[in-house]
């Protein structure tokens, strides 16, 4: 059993092949990889930045117009003579305290467009499990002039890793129009993205940018209007400082997306004098759900190093590809393969000779060395034959001591 053969070790060998095809291809690969690492990954994709998704908070509030328009101007009101494709109802005027329900939090905001009011009494004891409220009267009305109510949106973003924090008044902002263009609004009432000013939009302007028509057909019931059933819309606020190469430039962008096949309704029970008398409100309207996202980047050496290391792996792949082309596909593949791969003879005999030489230097081990030499002489002829066979089989290969070969 030849242990040297079983536990053989493969090591890299440098061979210079003077072939313009292989050399040119390898240079092209190198140039492309360097361009990919430096130009694309590092500069264009900003591989030197550590990016994170910011978190934040949102405060939204509603304000009624200073002067309401007459309800005769609205075709959804029953005292308007203009034809309306959906159900007409009475129209009532309410202030922001009544229209904004439930009270907004940092993730959603609701605006009432229709409210059904039930005057209910309890004519029995509430301790009786079969006792139910009885409806005395019912009114179903639209909220007049809801499009002229204004909503103020104040939001703050925070990047936990880089500790970057800004309020919306400190940043430039934009809102996407119906053509997905980023626009700023600086009008008498409507303002969006102007540094130093709060973001204020009328409900009508907000719905217009979201492509939502309150007097269009509801996606839940086509016989009802959106004003009647209500609607849910997602308001995305996307923060970024990676849109340019100056990470000190920040911006945010509003985008509003209607949620299809949904309506919005919320009940409210208001106790009057006592529990036996209450007003029950069934509200329908517009629900806005705010979602803060985006990408905030800051310089990070580890991110830059990772970009370079991941790109350098491509260099090794390019070398493997050129090697495989040389030893498997080119007409000279056998010649190239013979120079690339070299098998050495076993080194057991060399180690034995070295051990004998060291033992001969020690007089105390001379007798044992002589015995070992006699035993080894019995195998000399066999080893010589082995070496001759090895030399024949490796015709075309270089000696292992020639580590650098130039063709």
From Swiss-Prot:
The organism sits in which domain of life?
A: Eukaryota
Gene null: resulting phenotype: Null cells are still capable of osmoregulation and do not show any noticeable differences in their sensitivity to hypotonic conditions. Quintuple p2xA/p2xB/p2xC/p2xD/p2xE null cells display slight delay in their osmoregulatory response, but are still capable of regulating their cell volume in water. Extracellular purinergic response to ATP persists in the quintuple null cells and p2xD single null strains with no alteration in the kinetics of the response, but the magnitude of the response is lower.
Report biased composition (Acidic residues) as residue ranges.
Answer: 381-391
* Span list, region Disordered: 371-394
Chief localization = membrane
Cytoplasmic topological domain ranges are 1-22, 322-407
This entry's Gene Ontology molecular function terms read: ATP-gated ion channel activity; intracellularly ATP-gated calcium channel activity
Q: Where is this region: Pore-forming motif?
A: 283-296
Report if keyword Nucleotidyltransferase is assigned.
no
GO process terms (BP): calcium ion transmembrane transport; cellular hypotonic response; regulation of calcium-mediated signaling
Is the Membrane keyword given for this protein?
yes
Topological region Lumenal = 44-300
TM segment ranges: 23-43, 301-321
**What does UniProt give as the signal peptide span?**
none
Where is the protein localized?
Answer: Contractile vacuole membrane
Single GO cellular component annotation?
Answer: contractile vacuolar membrane
Q: Which Pfam families match?
A: P2X_receptor
Q: Which UniProt keywords apply?
A: Ion channel, Ion transport, Ligand-gated ion channel, Membrane, Receptor, Transmembrane, Transmembrane helix, Transport, Vacuole
Disulphides:
none
Instruction: Explain the purpose of this protein.
Output: P2X receptors are ligand-gated ion channels that play a role in intracellular calcium signaling. ATP does not evoke inward currents in p2xD. Not essential for osmoregulation.
Q: Which PANTHER family match?
A: P2X PURINOCEPTOR (PTHR10125), P2X RECEPTOR A-RELATED (PTHR10125:SF27)
Similarity field: Belongs to the P2X receptor family.
**The protein's name in its UniProt record:** P2X receptor D
């Amino acid at each position: 059993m030849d242990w040297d053969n079983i536990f053989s070790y493969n090591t890299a060998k440098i061979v210079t092949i003077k072939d313009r095809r292989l050399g040119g291809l390898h240079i092209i690969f190198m140039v492309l990889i360097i361009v990919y690492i430096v130009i694309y990954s590092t500069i264009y994709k900003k591989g030197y930045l550590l990016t994170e998704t910011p978190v934040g908070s949102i405060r939204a509030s509603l304000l009624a117009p200073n002067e309401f328009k007459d309800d005769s101007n609205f075709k959804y009101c029953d005292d308007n003579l203009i034809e309306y494709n959906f159900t007409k109802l009475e129209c009532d005027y309410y202030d922001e305290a009544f229209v904004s329900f439930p009270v907004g939090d940092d993730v959603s905001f609701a605006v009432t467009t229709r409210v059904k009011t039930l005057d209910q009494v309890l004519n029995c004891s509430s301790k009786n499990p079969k006792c139910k409220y009885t409806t005395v009267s019912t009114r179903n009305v639209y909220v007049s002039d809801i499009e002229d109510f204004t909503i103020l949106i104040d939001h703050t973003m925070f990047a936990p890793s880089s500790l970057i924090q800004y309020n919306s008044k400190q940043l430039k902002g934009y809102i996407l129009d119906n053509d997905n263009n980023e626009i700023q609004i600086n009008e008498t009432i409507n303002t969006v993205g102007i540094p130093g000013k709060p973001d204020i939009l009328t409900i009508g302007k907000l719905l217009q940018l979201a492509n939502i028509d309150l007097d269009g057909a509801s996606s839940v019931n086509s016989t009802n209007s959106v004003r009647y059933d209500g609607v849910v819309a997602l308001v995305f606020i996307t923060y970024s400082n990676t849109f340019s190469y100056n990470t000190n430039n920040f911006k945010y962008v509003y985008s509003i997306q209607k949620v299809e096949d949904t309506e919005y309704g919320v009940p409210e029970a208001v106790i009057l004098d006592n529990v036996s008398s209450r007003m029950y409100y069934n509200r329908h309207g517009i629900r806005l759900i705010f979602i803060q996202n985006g990408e905030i980047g800051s310089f990070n050496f580890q991110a830059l190093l990772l970009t370079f290391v991941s790109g350098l792996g491509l260099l090794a792949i390019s070398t493997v590809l050129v090697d495989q082309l040389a030893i498997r596909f080119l007409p000279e593949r056998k010649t190239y393969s013979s120079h690339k791969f070299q098998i050495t003879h076993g080194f057991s005999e060399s180690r034995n000779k070295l051990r004998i030489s060291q033992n001969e230097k020690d007089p105390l081990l001379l007798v044992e060395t002589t015995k070992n030499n006699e035993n080894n002489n019995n195998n000399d002829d066999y080893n010589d034959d082995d070496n001759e066979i090895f030399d024949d089989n490796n015709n075309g290969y270089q000696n292992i001591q020639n580590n650098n070969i130039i063709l």
